Amino acid sequence: MFGLGRPQPTSAEKIAAVENELKVVAEMHSRMVKICTLKCIDKSYREGDLSKGESVCLDRCAAKFFETHQKISDQLQKETQARGGGGFGM
């Protein structure tokens, strides 16, 4: 009744969904680190610590990366709901 006719996922399916989500988050983090490092940190590594400019650049880059990711996720969710789908293959 409350599941809207869909069977409840099994424990194995729940674990697989969490593992998949973790994989997606890890891949997103890797992409963000790679992109922001290439953009913000000089290849010559003059100092052991980040300069103020590098630190600010990395902070802004990461914020923009996550903001863009959120906007894309929201748009995909709206499009999926508009088509009447319940989710990404689930």
Curated annotation (Swiss-Prot):
GO molecular function list: metal ion binding; protein transporter activity; unfolded protein binding
Disulphide bridges: 36-61, 40-57
Protein localization: Mitochondrion inner membrane
Motif (Twin CX3C motif): 36-61
Keyword presence, Hydrolase: no
Major localization class: mitochondrion
Coiled-coil regions listed in the entry: none
GO cellular component, one term: mitochondrial inner membrane
Signal peptide boundaries: none
UniProt record, GO biological process: protein insertion into mitochondrial inner membrane
Topology with respect to the bilayer: Peripheral membrane protein
Key words of the record: Chaperone, Disulfide bond, Membrane, Metal-binding, Mitochondrion, Mitochondrion inner membrane, Protein transport, Translocation, Transport, Zinc
Self-association state and partner proteins as the record states: Heterohexamer; composed of 3 copies of tim9 and 3 copies of tim10, named soluble 70 kDa complex. Associates directly with the TIM22 complex, whose core is composed of tim22 and tim54. Interacts with the transmembrane regions of multi-pass transmembrane proteins in transit.
Primary role: Mitochondrial intermembrane chaperone that participates in the import and insertion of multi-pass transmembrane proteins into the mitochondrial inner membrane. Also required for the transfer of beta-barrel precursors from the TOM complex to the sorting and assembly machinery (SAM complex) of the outer membrane. Acts as a chaperone-like protein that protects the hydrophobic precursors from aggregation and guide them through the mitochondrial intermembrane space.
Notes on the domains: The twin CX3C motif contains 4 conserved Cys residues that form 2 disulfide bonds in the mitochondrial intermembrane space. However, during the transit of tim10 from cytoplasm into mitochondrion, the Cys residues probably coordinate zinc, thereby preventing folding and allowing its transfer across mitochondrial outer membrane.
Stated family: Belongs to the small Tim family.
Name of the protein in question: Mitochondrial import inner membrane translocase subunit tim10
Annotated source species: Neurospora crassa (strain ATCC 24698 / 74-OR23-1A / CBS 708.71 / DSM 1257 / FGSC 987)
